[in-house]
Amino acid sequence: MTELKIKTAKVEKHLAKEPLKPVLKTPTQKIDSSGKFYATGKRKNAVARVWIKVGKGKIVVNKKTIDQYFPSETYVKTILRPFVLTNTIDQYDVICTVRGGGVSGQKGAILHGISKALDKSVPDFHTILRKGGLLTRDSRVVERKKYGQRKARKKTQFSKR
């Protein structure tokens, strides 16, 4: 007990001489040597690693064009939403790798990653993307199956007699 008092007294003396300065963490921009902005997006079990750079609007997903990777046009329109909101269609080239999950989860992960990378490239886009709901991660995941039940919430049939 006396050792603790001595240690706290030493700390207080040290703080009296030099008060603590607040450590401010500045956000580090993830930019590589070729000027690409990097961000990760997540949705369900899918994780997308996204790099964007100023270009002509070319989008590559897992070494395929976006039309080859997502045959449905609605998926492509959803992925292009950040560019539509910020009015930057055909101004950025996007390269992304996606792993895990299904097609819908991968679409959401790419959308989230592109939004975060656009936010890093031009900080003025932050409010636009935030209001559009594109910067928040959708945390809904599949609920686990419980033992003694058929599914996550479905129970076995109840028999009164």
Curated annotation (Swiss-Prot):
GO MF annotation terms: RNA binding; structural constituent of ribosome
Give the UniProt keywords, A-Z. Ribonucleoprotein, Ribosomal protein
Q: Which GO terms describe its biological process?
A: translation
The record ties this protein, via SUPFAM superfamilies, to: Ribosomal protein S5 domain 2-like
The record's listing under Gene3D superfamilies reads:
3.30.230.10
Q: Which GO terms describe its cellular component?
A: cytosolic small ribosomal subunit
Does the keyword field hold Cytoplasm? no
Lineage, top-rank taxon, reads: Bacteria
InterPro entries for this protein:
Ribosomal_Su5_D2-typ_SF, Ribosomal_uS9, Ribosomal_uS9_bac/plastid, Ribosomal_uS9_CS, Ribsml_uS5_D2-typ_fold_subgr
| PANTHER family xrefs | RIBOSOMAL PROTEIN S9 (PTHR21569), SMALL RIBOSOMAL SUBUNIT PROTEIN US9M (PTHR21569:SF1)
- Family listed: Belongs to the universal ribosomal protein uS9 family.
Q: Which HAMAP family match?
A: Ribosomal_uS9_B (MF_00532_B)
Task: Give the protein's recorded name.
Answer: Small ribosomal subunit protein uS9
